[in-house]
Amino acid sequence: MKAIYGALAGAIGLLACSAGALAQQNLDTFRIAIGGFGLWATEAPRLGQQAGIFKKHGINVEYYATAGAGESLQAVISGSADLSVGVGTTGVMGAFAKGAPVRIFGANFTGAGDLYWYARAESPLRSLKDATEKTVLGFSSNGSSSNTVAVALAEETGGKMKLLAAGDQASTFTQVMSGQIDLGWAAPPFGLKEIAEGKIRIVATGNDAPALRDQTVRVDIASLKVMTERKEALARYVKAYRETLDWMYADPRAIEMWAANIGVPVEYARKAAFDFQPKAARDFDTITGLDKLMEGAVRQKFLAAPLTQEQLSTLIQIVK
């Protein structure tokens, strides 16, 4: 009798596993490359997946980290990723102008107040006014939003500083602390602990470049193949994404989950989300400051000339 019950239990377990696998197979999967992995502004795919929001809409997301938004853009262009979130707008414009099969399907972040630049505590740099021709300021990768902001900050100093692609936040921090570069980029909560401990101090934020305050510096992108061949699934992804954004700012559990994901105290996570990345800056439907963004892209040589209205209409296709 025990053998019969054991066999029955095993069969039931096998059926449950099979049903779970079948349910997973019935979900539409999107592979997402994330440059600023772990940042609040790029955390919606992971949190929405963990909270079951995407599954509710028949979507499964597979996310992975890249060294920066530039690498994420290339992943979408090559087809190794379907989507990316938080990619520098000017970099996307430049790639599109060169014929890359990529489209913008939503805004990610407007303004630049969520990024800051820091120096070692013993550094003589206390503000951008202290920068010289020898000052090296780091950003993540070419075409990223930190690249756009770095250029704008350099312009505020009269073009004095040297700019360097320094990689992700951890790599940049190592370079600052070892003296390889003078100013490193970061987005909270990264660095808040070190600031509190007096190891580093903030020298500038994205808001020190006033021209960027009303510009949508980061966008969410999809491959042309996804936009044309998977419209219905992408619409469900966007519906789940919007629901996730609302939940992230309304439910305290979202902050707790994020803090656990990135291994920081909840108070640091809460400060990073609500002080540096308010929901107003996360309007998915509105991309602003395009003329200024294109001017910057031309100066940065991402664009040979501003995109035409027809080109912009082709590139930007907000999914409702």
Go through the PLM ranges and name each one:
Residues 1-9:
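Bacterial N-terminal signal peptides that target proteins for export
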Residues 17-23:
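Sec/Tat signal peptide C-region and signal peptidase I cleavage site
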Residues 24, 228, 319-320:
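Short, solvent-exposed mixed-charge patches
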Residues 24-159, 163-166, 175-178, 182-188, ...:
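Short, glycine-/small- and polar/acidic-enriched structural segments
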Residues 56, 208-213, 278-286:
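Short, solvent-exposed loop/beta-turn-alpha elements that line the ligand-binding surface or hinge
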Residues 170-260:
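Pocket-lining segment of extracytoplasmic ligand-binding domains
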Residues 227-303:
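Secondary-structure end/capping motifs
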Residues 297-320:
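Conserved C-terminal helix/tail region of periplasmic/extracytoplasmic solute-binding proteins
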